[in-house]
Amino acid sequence: MKKLTLLFVLLASVSVGCKKKGCTDANATNYNANANSDDASCTYPAETETGPYLIVKLHFDSLAPRLDNFGNPATIPSNHWAQSPVFYGMSAHYIEFAQNMYTQLGAGEILYHGAETTAGGSNAVDFSKAIIKGDNEVFMKIPLKNISPDTYNWVRMSLTYQNYSLDYRYNGVDYNGRLASFVGFNTYITNYKIWNQTVTLNANKLQGYWGFENLGVVVQGQAAATTVPNPLSATSPVPAGSCVVTGNFDTPFTITGNETEDIICTMSLSTNKSFEWYDANGDHKYEPGAGDYPTDMGLRGLKPIITP
């Protein structure tokens, strides 16, 4: 009898010593049915957002007004020329709805603020996490319930990246190449693909950095300026180098909080002669080999368009 009791004790001790740790919550995504000891590793599905949504789209308009930094019509300076590129992709880092002309940057309704990093030293946009979309594509969807009920008159959008084709001339022959330009305040770039070629940097690049590719050859450079139209510069300025483009709704846009259907907000961006260069010989052809160089590659205006 003593031997039998001792056997039970030994079996009990073995049972206690063989506890299997894991997630014991059946509602978790990593529930372990074989676990008998919770190890605090449970993970749960992210809360699914529901509509209706504000659907933000991008549109590139080469026929829209060409504006300067103050939102006024802009002409091309003497000894310069410009062309309207064909856009293949663009990224924005920040979107904000502003109530009126006195609403300061950051004091409106911030709809989106992209990822940033200090991996390259100073704070910068994290290009590896950038959302890049083409013409008329959906940039993002925001549940309308997450937007504060109010009436908004202006949109502010910080652009960070552009990818487009350019016509140029070399040794008397016309070609078409691809340019990737980084127009954000500062961007940490691990690598990026221009057309067929990938450029590896693992470094920060300030506003105006660009890479150009054609026939398998990549050339890199830095533009001297980036136009950022802000019609509210007198009442609500933006920091230099921020690339925050400002545009107004044709009619005030009101969020009531009782919306039942999706609303589309198309960010129509002016690409009208947005790539400008110093034209050394005045032939209106972009000829890097003849002394031409980029002087401006900023967008030339923003018009937010609401479609119920």
Q: For the regions a protein language model found, what residue spans apply to each?
A:
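Sec-dependent bacterial lipoprotein signal peptides
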Residues: 1-17
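A generic structural micro-environment signature
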Residues: 7-10, 29, 37, 98, ...
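Bacterial Sec-dependent N-terminal signal peptides
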Residues: 15-56
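A short, solvent-exposed, low-complexity linear motif enriched for acidic/polar residues
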Residues: 46-308
